[in-house]
Amino acid sequence: PNAVEPTISWVLAEKTILIDPGHGGIFPGRVNENNMLEKDINLQIATTLEQYLAESGANIMMTRRTDTDLVPETAQTEKLLLQQRADLETRIQLSEQYNADYLLSIHCNSIPNEKWHGAQTFYNPEDIESKNLAKAIQSSLNNQLEGNEREALPREGTYLFKNASTTTVIIECGFLSNPEESSKLQEPAYQQQLAWAIYRGLQNYLAE
């Protein structure tokens, strides 16, 4: 075993991390031609990530643990767009309520072109910590996942980035629009690989 491993694990102790499986409930997220729902994949990867982080002594919170949205009752009669906004606002409120050090939002990508593939991180262009954390997680994803060669990118105008005071990174775990990748994203072993890569990226960032 690597001698530095205990030291690296220790960096997560006492850190409060909010894991946010994107979408849920009335919001399926991306849906591919085989009716794979992004919300389900997000939750499976997030739950595995929670296990890895909890074992390292971090204080872990989840925005959801079941197939539910986070629209408060007061907004449930609003138009869908306003419900989506309210759902995101609840996620931000949770990050503040838990006094989270980091908010990791787990998603899957999809575009009208089947050729694109790979897991990719996005960061808040106004937050240097968000950028550095996204780059560390991206580096880990590229190291752990065969053929993954994407780079961390800023994402302008994202509601989470514009409104969360917590250092936030969005992780798009792959493309549901790519048949081969969407098939892998359903496999527990691949979900574990993704979760492990995210976990190690966070470790590496904190160990720097």
For each feature predicted by the language model, list its residue ranges.
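Catalytic-site microenvironment of enzymes
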Residues: 1-208
